């Protein structure tokens, strides 16, 4: 009897004698459902399972295949596609080998199976993988399968339960019976499952189907608009009956198409020509009729904004070969069904006006549209993979797919079922991310009750806010009797933390906190807890008391100095130690041998009037939360990390969707709905409390944007209107620049304009104690908006996600500005806290070693006592190519050893399931696979894999950075101070966490990297293109300044946050990080005026460098993004060797690469009279980079990456002419070295400093030269004499492409694309001897270059690539040795040279060799050649003999392409040339 192996995925439960497998929590989890056969399959055996149960809330379904991995030793991945080391999986209708797709469109689409269907997998006797569906063989899916394999089934997505039926060879006559059944009347395969994708998504929990459907569809649609995922439905198998006689050709566009259509990409892509001039004549059809149930799906690649209307798609019975294509398909009056907008047109007439809720006119680039004709004749359309239902019930059997590229639609591509599994996983990830309550608690064990205050409290204390807040209502009348205890005992390692809400300035002393063994239900509470004489430990002031007696005098932070907004906490560790925290910072061990089951206690004594319990959701976001507003930089003071308990109220407008635990709100259907998205705060605002949100997403479809304000109406009493300005009572709103009360405008031109704010901007509202309403933009007070808010009434914050604003999140606010209960006095305890700065950083998980304290919102980890128990994890799984990087913050040198870093497949949530918790060292993590770098070794589960992998980690110091990354090829990489140490291990699964062991001398770490999912593109590290959004309305400009004083030029005081101005604002320095370094000029750039800056300082710690350009918006109102590339409106930027317009690259290969400019380089900008923008490099005009610029433009410089300081030099050197005379231009040399006006250095004079660049190509060529193991004695010692002739360096020096040299002068080509390494001249020769010789090149090879250098000359008969007669040499002199008594050979072969490398470097004469770069570990191809001096008159010229004429150099005559010489001493080696591809 066939059975399943008892070892399974972690969410699988087995029953029925290990024959039935079910996925636990199927509504919350869609993976972790792997099962494997109990034994290897025998020859020809079919392992058959039945699909018992499905759940339609996920995408994807069962996956099945074979694996060579023994389940007894297998580390089960989250899904079958994660199996490595010999696995073959059928997913959907794709076949994957070790996770990589090897076959598309195979057999039956497993995603379309229904309950009761049978699926089998077989390894045939010949080693082929066969899939069987309902007893029918789908054919060979793969070959070369080893004989010992196990069957594997993944209960993924919709599939929640299966049962094993059998494991035996198929009957011999089964194939014949199948053939007979196909000819007869066979019941269709899909009879047991619905023909239509279910529109209802009802769940067992009673969630309304319409609401859930809307949530899911909008979430997926939003994800598509954000290009987060793309889902392509697999093609179901062709129906057996009634299918038209079609061929098996791939589905492509027909060659005959509309008059303006251009086909490309193998007829898979269609594009309309002249899209800005014509809007129709863009009809394309498929090359063959569609099969039944075949998906015809296209992706929108390009849209234009000029026209109304957009793409139309459908089917037609007309054969494209005989059809005369109309201007639009809606003109056809027969045999045509088209979807246009959101309706259906049949033969040009509307048959269904509202077919679906999505309009084709609203789709964006990257969206998918598909259609399929079912075997029943029903026509279905799909938008981004979602079935829109039946569009037509009686579709003819033979139809062609047709697309009309009309109006805005310009370019589409047919897409097939590529990356099927990845699309489904991204789809499911979006589904779960958009349902915040789904899958948060995967453990089946119930959590302990919420930690609250007990109702039994001190005589003068009261418990409010559902047990979370304790206060002394009459704090100015009495200073004690304010003791409150927790409602249950603390668990081990459970932190009890409270925030001080209110204080009074009347008394001395303040809050006290601690633990007690007394149960609050039976305790007669004293006036202060220090009066208890048993079972009590309290922190008071800056001391610790036990049973009323002081045991520590000077301990930690003085609690009497705390102010409102500060936090204090206490925790009992497993080892019985007691630790206190102040503002999240551990104060160290306060007591030992504290018994378990102690209650937390807070004494609201003296000045402390109110405190609130801070739960985990207040301090740390849940794993996977993507709330940019809650992320804080590692440098943020811990005192600022006490986030507010404010949330969005659960009652809201119809189009609002609350996610992220009430901290994020988004508007559904953002491109079809612009209002009905009002949200309110979850509770009333306190006086002086700021309610602050950050804008996270905007669309450019609507006019108007976010509106914000306050109301005295309770959410329960409000019938939410379309917009909040419709309310005519008790409401105050800011809309644009207008302040409105009860729907009427109070004042215009308020200090800020909400319509001009873009993504990343923060908006705050605060009601003062006097009843004034203030607004804050990015933390800056905009002044009083209105006065007279009602005193004594509850005031709620209101946000209206209107128009362009789609999504916002809470930042946590700024706390209370005035918390004093005395209205006439303001003390230092009521000073406002600063607003947290929105930023996105990686975090450590709260689950950690028992000696570790995770602080500062999870961005810092410190080890307390001892040298072990210091394991910490990343807060979530690492994404592919995501770097988790930390910085060493503290070292204690009296310990030996250092930290370890790596990855583990052990989830922090599973630590509680380990017996005894986390071990002392990360090397002992063996329950799941763990890879670590310890010292310089790489280990796997404690077993050594590699030695001497990198520099020893024991050498790290304070400030050192360590990073870990899992690459897309499943390799583990370690980074030290930003440098990749190369692959450390391979075969790393997807679901891994970063793990570190804070061991030995390392005692504190902090995260310095950022999340790939959460991070805005504009803040990514250098060398990554930034594409973040920048929303900025153009401002009114004054008249341009036609005359400008050069000496008065200075940078504007409004600049990037990392910029420091000096020297009269003429010098800008970036003082930290690699971005946020934008500076601008306050004056517009006049026409024909050359503005210049000089690069003063570069840092080798970063990649990439400065950008320079102009903007057409007023710099006074510019919200500076992180990089210049993030400016999306009215900007023209020179970056690297490209030109960007509004963040989009419009030109490549312009001028030199700015990333390679050294210190001292002068860069300039000039606007010509016709509006053309010119870039100047060291006074050299690089030509027009952009045209038709507006009249008013402001200069912008971005100090990015390597560039740390620039200075304005326009006042020091007026114009390009003066600048050219101040310093020698690149390539400039003495007049005596000039021949026919072309400059040339003859004796290896050191090149211009501009050429001495840190060029990556030169470094790569140098590494290859080192691999040749050539003696250093052959080369000049000074490495600065090596010259790179790559395109960037060549342009930067201003070198000519061709030069003339010798007497008489002869032209030769520069070695562009090569690197030159100068060779030593023979001691017998002089430099001046060869000044009048000509220059030529000879191709060589990596295997013969050493012999040529040993000989020292290209003699006739030397062992070069073009000659074959051997010759002897004298190794001592390095020159040929004459052979006594031997006559020279009569027939010497000529040495063949050429004045151009286009000929000398042909593969026949200069073969390419492959090598692995020791630094990047990538494979490259390399060529070597020699540059030689040739004596005039010693050679003959001739036509090429090695290739056709059309491959020659256009400047070198073909009759002079070869130099042939047989004379001894006619050539001298000048340099070794290397080219790498």
Swiss-Prot record:
Keywords: Cytoplasm, Cytoskeleton, Repeat, Ubl conjugation, Ubl conjugation pathway. It is found in: Cytoplasm, Cytoskeleton, Microtubule organizing center, Centrosome, Centriole. The keyword Repeat applies. CDD domains: SPRY_NHR_like. Ubiquitinated. This ubiquitination leads to proteasomal degradation. Its main location: cytoplasm. One of its GO terms (cellular component) is centriole. It holds the Pfam family Neuralized. Residues 171-183 have a biased composition (Acidic residues). Residues 1-167, 250-417, 450-616, 645-813, 841-1010, 1048-1211 form the NHR domain. InterPro entries: B30.2/SPRY_sf, ConA-like_dom_sf, Neuralized, NHR_dom. Residues 1-26, 168-196, 1012-1041 are annotated as: Disordered. PROSITE patterns: NHR (PS51065). Promotes CCP110 ubiquitination and proteasome-dependent degradation. By counteracting accumulation of CP110, maintains normal centriolar homeostasis and preventing formation of ectopic microtubular organizing centers. This is Neuralized-like protein 4. It comes from Xenopus tropicalis (Western clawed frog). The lineage of its organism: Eukaryota, Metazoa, Chordata, Craniata, Vertebrata.
């Amino acid at each position: 009897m066939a059975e399943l192996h008892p070892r399974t995925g972690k969410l699988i439960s087995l029953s029925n004698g290990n024959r039935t497998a079910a996925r636990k929590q199927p509504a919350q989890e869609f993976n972790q459902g792997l099962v494997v056969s109990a034994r290897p399959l025998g020859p020809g055996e079919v392992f058959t399972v039945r699909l018992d149960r499905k759940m339609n809330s996920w995408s994807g379904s069962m996956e099945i295949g074979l694996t060579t991995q023994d389940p007894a030793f297998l580390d089960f991945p989250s899904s079958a596609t994660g199996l490595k080391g010999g696995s073959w999986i059928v997913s959907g209708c794709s076949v994957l080998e070790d996770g990589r797709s090897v076959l598309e469109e195979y057999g039956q689409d497993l995603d379309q199976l229904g309950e009761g269907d049978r699926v089998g997998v077989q390894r045939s006797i010949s080693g082929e993988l066969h899939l069987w569906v309902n007893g029918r063989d789908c054919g060979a899916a793969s070959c070369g399968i080893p004989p010992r394999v196990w069957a594997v089934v993944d209960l993924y997505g919709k599939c929640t339960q299966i049962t094993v039926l059998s494991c035996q060879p198929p009957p011999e006559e089964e194939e014949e019976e199948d053939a007979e059944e196909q000819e007869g009347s066979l019941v269709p395969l899909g009879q047991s499952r619905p023909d239509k994708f279910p529109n209802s998504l009802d769940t067992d929990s009673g969630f309304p189907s319409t609401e859930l459907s809307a949530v899911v569809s909008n979430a997926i649609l939003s994800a598509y608009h954000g290009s987060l995922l793309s889902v392509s439905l697999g093609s179901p198998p062709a129906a057996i009956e009634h299918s038209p006689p079609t061929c098996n050709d791939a589905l492509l566009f027909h060659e005959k198409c509309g008059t303006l259509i251009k086909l490309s990409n193998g007829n898979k892509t269609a594009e309309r020509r002249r899209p800005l001039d014509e809007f129709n004549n863009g009809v394309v059809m498929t090359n063959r009729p569609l099969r039944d149930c075949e998906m015809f799906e296209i992706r929108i690649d390009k849209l234009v904004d000029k026209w109304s209307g957009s793409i139309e798609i459908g089917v037609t019975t007309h054969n494209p070969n005989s059809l005369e294509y109309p201007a639009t398909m809606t003109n056809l009056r027969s045999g045509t069904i088209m979807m246009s907008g959101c309706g259906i047109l049949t033969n040009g007439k509307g048959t269904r006006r509202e077919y679906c809720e999505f309009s084709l006119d609203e789709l964006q680039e990257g969206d998918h549209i598909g259609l399929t004709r079912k075997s029943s004749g029903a026509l279905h359309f799909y938008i981004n993979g979602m079935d829109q239902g039946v569009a037509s019930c009686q579709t003819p059997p033979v139809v062609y797919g047709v697309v009309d590229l009309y109006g805005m639609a310009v370019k589409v591509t047919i897409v097939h079922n590529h990356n099927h599994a990845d699309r489904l996983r991204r789809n499911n990830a979006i589904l779960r991310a958009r349902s915040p309550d789904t899958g948060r608690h995967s453990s089946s064990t119930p959590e302990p009750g919420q930690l609250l205050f007990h109702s039994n409290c001190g005589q003068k204390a009261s418990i409010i806010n559902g047990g979370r807040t304790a206060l002394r209502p009459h704090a100015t009348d009495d200073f004690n009797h304010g003791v409150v205890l927790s409602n249950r005992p603390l668990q081990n390692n459970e932190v009890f933390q409270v925030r001080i809400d209110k204080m009074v300035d009347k008394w001395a002393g303040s809050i006290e906190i601690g633990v007690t063994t007394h149960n609050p239900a039976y305790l007669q509470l004293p006036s202060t807890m220090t009066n208890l004489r048993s079972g009590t430990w309290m922190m008071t002031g800056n001391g610790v008391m036990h049973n009323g007696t002081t045991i520590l005098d000077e301990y930690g932070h003085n609690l009497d100095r705390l102010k409102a907004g500060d936090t204090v906490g206490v925790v009992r560790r497993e080892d019985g130690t007691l630790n206190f925290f102040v503002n999240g910072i551990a104060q160290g061990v306060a007591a030992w041998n504290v018994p378990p089951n102690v209650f937390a206690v807070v004494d609201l004594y003296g000045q402390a009037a109110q405190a609130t319990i801070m739960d985990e959701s207040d301090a740390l976001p849940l794993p996977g939360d993507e709330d940019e507003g809650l992320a804080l930089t590692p440098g943020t003071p811990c005192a600022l990390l006490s986030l507010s308990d404010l949330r969005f109220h659960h009652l809201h407008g119809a189009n609002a969707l609350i996610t992220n635990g009430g901290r994020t709100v988004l508007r559904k259907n953002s491109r079809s709905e612009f209002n009905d998205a009002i949200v309110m705060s979850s509770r009333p605002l306190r006086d002086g409390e700021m309610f602050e949100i950050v804008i996270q997403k905007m669309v450019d479809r609507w006019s108007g944007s976010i509106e914000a304000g306050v109301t005295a109406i309770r959410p329960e009493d409000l019938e939410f209107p379309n917009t909040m300005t419709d309310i005519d009572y008790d409401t105050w709103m800011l809309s644009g620049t207008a302040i409105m009360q009860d729907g009427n405008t109070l004042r215009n031109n308020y200090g800020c304009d909400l319509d001009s704010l873009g993504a990343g901007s923060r908006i705050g509202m605060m009601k003062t104690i006097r009843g004034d309403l203030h607004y804050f933009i990015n933390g800056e007070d905009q002044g009083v908006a209105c006065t007279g808010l009602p005193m004594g009434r509850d005031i709620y914050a209101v946000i209206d996600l209107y128009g362009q604003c789609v999504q916002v999140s809470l930042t946590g606010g700024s706390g209370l500005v005035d918390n004093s209960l005395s209205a006439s006095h303001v003390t230092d305890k009521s000073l406002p806290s600063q607003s947290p700065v929105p930023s996105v950083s990686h975090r450590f998980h709260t689950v950690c070693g028992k000696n570790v304290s995770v602080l500062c919102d999870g961005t810092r980890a410190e080890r307390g006592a001892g040298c072990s128990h210091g394991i910490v994890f990343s807060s979530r799984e690492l994404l592919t190519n995501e770097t988790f990087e930390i910085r060493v913050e503290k070292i204690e040198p009296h310990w030996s050893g250092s930290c370890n870093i790596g990855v583990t497949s052990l989830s922090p949530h599973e630590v509680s399931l380990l017996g005894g918790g986390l071990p002392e060292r990360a090397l002992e993590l063996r329950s799941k696979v763990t890879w670590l770098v310890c010292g310089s070794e790489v280990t796997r589960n404690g077993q050594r894999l590699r030695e001497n992998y990198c520099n020893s980690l024991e050498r790290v110091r304070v400030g050192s950075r360590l990073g870990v990354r899992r690459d897309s090829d499943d390799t583990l990489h370690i980074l030290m101070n930003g440098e990749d140490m190369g692959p450390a291990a391979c075969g790393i699964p997807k679901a891994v966490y970063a793990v570190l062991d804070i061991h030995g001398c390392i005692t504190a770490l902090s995260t310095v990297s950022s999340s790939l999912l959460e991070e805005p593109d504009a803040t990514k590290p250098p060398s990554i293109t930034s594409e973040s959004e920048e929303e900025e309305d153009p401002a009114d400009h004054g008249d341009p300044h036609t005359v400008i004083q050069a000496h008065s030029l200075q940078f504007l005081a409004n600049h990037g946050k990392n910029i420091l101005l000096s020297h009269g604002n003429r010098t800008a320095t970036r003082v930290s990080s690699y971005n946020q370094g934008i500076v601008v000029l306050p004056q517009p750039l006049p026409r024909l005026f050359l503005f210049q800056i000089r690069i003063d300082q570069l840092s080798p710690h970063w990649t990439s460098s400065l950008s320079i350009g102009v903007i057409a918006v007023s710099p006074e109102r510019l919200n500076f993004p992180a990089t210049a590339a993030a400016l999306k409106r009215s900007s023209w930027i020179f970056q690297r060797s490209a030109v960007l317009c509004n963040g989009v690259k419009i030109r490549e290969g312009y001028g030199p690469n700015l990333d390679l400019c050294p210190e001292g380089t002068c860069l300039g900008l000039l606007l010509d009279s016709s509006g053309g923008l010119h870039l100047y490099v060291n006074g050299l005009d690089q030509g027009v980079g952009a045209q038709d610029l507006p009249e008013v433009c402001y200069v912008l410089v971005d100090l990015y990456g390597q560039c740390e300081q620039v200075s304005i030099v326009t006042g020091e050197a007026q114009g390009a002419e003066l600048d050219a005379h101040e310093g020698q231009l690149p390539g400039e040399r003495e007049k005596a070295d000039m021949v026919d006006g072309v400059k040339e250095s003859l004796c290896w004079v050191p090149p211009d400093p501009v050429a001495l660049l840190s060029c990556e190509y030169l470094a790569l060529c140098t590494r290859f030269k080192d691999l040749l193991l050539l003696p250093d004695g052959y080369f000049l010692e000074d490495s600065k004499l090596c010259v790179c002739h790559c395109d960037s360096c060549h342009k930067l020096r201003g070198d000519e492409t061709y030069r003339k040299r010798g007497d008489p002068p002869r032209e030769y080509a520069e070695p562009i694309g090569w690197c030159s390494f100068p060779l030593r001249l023979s001691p017998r020769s002089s430099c001046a001897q060869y000044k009048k010789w000509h220059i030529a090149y000879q191709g060589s090879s990596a295997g013969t270059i050493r012999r040529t250098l040993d000989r020292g000359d290209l003699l006739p008969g030397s062992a070069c690539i073009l000659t074959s007669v051997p010759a002897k040499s004298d190794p001592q002199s390095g020159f040929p040795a004459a052979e006594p008594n031997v006559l020279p050979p009569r027939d010497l072969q000529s040495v063949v040279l050429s004045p151009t490398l286009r000929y000398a470097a042909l593969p026949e004469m200069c073969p390419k060799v492959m090598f692995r770069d020791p630094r990047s570990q990538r494979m490259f191809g390399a060529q070597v050649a020699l540059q030689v001096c040739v004596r005039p008159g010693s050679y003959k010229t001739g036509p090429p003999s090695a290739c056709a004429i059309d491959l020659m150099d256009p400047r070198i005559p073909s009759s002079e392409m070869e130099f042939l010489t047989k004379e001894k001493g006619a050539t001298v080696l000048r340099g070794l040339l290397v080219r790498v591809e």
